[in-house]
Amino acid sequence: MRITQFLASKLKNFSNLPKEYIERSKKQVYWQTPREKNYLPRTVERKRFRYTTNRPWTGQFRQQNMPATMRRKVLIEPVEDWSFFRGDRIEVLVGKDKGKQGIVTQVIPERNWVIVEGLNWHYRRVGAEKEFPGIIIKSEAPLHVLNDIRLVDPSDLLGTEFEWRFTEEGEKVRVSMRSGRIIPIPETNNQTHDYKTPNAYIEREKDTPAAVVGEITFQPKLSTFEMDIMEEMGIKEERTPAKSYWY
């Protein structure tokens, strides 16, 4: 569990959007009970989605998962140690680009996929209609992280196997098993569609400043909410509370 949480923290969310917003954008509710006290909360909604290279909050994702559209379940092998991130230099092990190296531009952990810039591409036709033949575009197909790629050792720029180890400072890093060189996680992994790096982000009018977010405004007290209101409004309780018993 700790390793999974660590890797999840390393795999930054490219959307930079609240998780609740993403879940709400892809949610498909077919039926639910009224919000009345005489009804039990029951909801019939879609729970199985087909994940592809389209982001879950986009219209293309919803088009591929239209309501009442049933698709065959895709069996995914769980990856306990997710080790590929945006910006990694990898070597392709299969296909027409076998032996070539490229940079990871997109990570799809739901399918154990990565997209490599300029590799494993093909042509496809889009926008075809009755009176328009459409256009041909170049599209990069995903590669499987368990069978199709491997990391490149930064010391000699050759493909290598690796393992996770701890440094003397307690930091968990990827280490090449051939040379012992640390393979750092690229800074590109912190990139979102809002900024390249967190330090380069320019605050907008509706953004809450970091100083305000980090300010401690909660003062822990033993008094209840009602007691705090009475204290602020100068109300003094002069009644004697009745005795209560625990059984």
From Swiss-Prot:
Residues 84-117 form the KOW domain. SMART domains: KOW. The keyword Endoplasmic reticulum does not apply. InterPro entries: KOW (IPR005824), Rib_uL2_dom2 (IPR014722), Ribosomal_uL24 (IPR003256), Ribosomal_uL24_CS (IPR005825), Ribosomal_uL24_KOW (IPR041988), Translation_prot_SH3-like_sf (IPR008991). Transmembrane segments: none annotated. It comes from the Eukaryota. It is found in: Mitochondrion. GO terms for cellular component: mitochondrial large ribosomal subunit. The keyword Translocase does not apply. GO terms for molecular function: RNA binding; structural constituent of ribosome. Keywords: Mitochondrion, Ribonucleoprotein, Ribosomal protein, Transit peptide. Its main location: mitochondrion. GO terms for biological process: translation. Component of the mitochondrial ribosome large subunit (39S) which comprises a 16S rRNA and about 50 distinct proteins. Belongs to the universal ribosomal protein uL24 family. This is Large ribosomal subunit protein uL24m. The lineage of its organism: Eukaryota, Metazoa, Ecdysozoa, Arthropoda, Hexapoda.
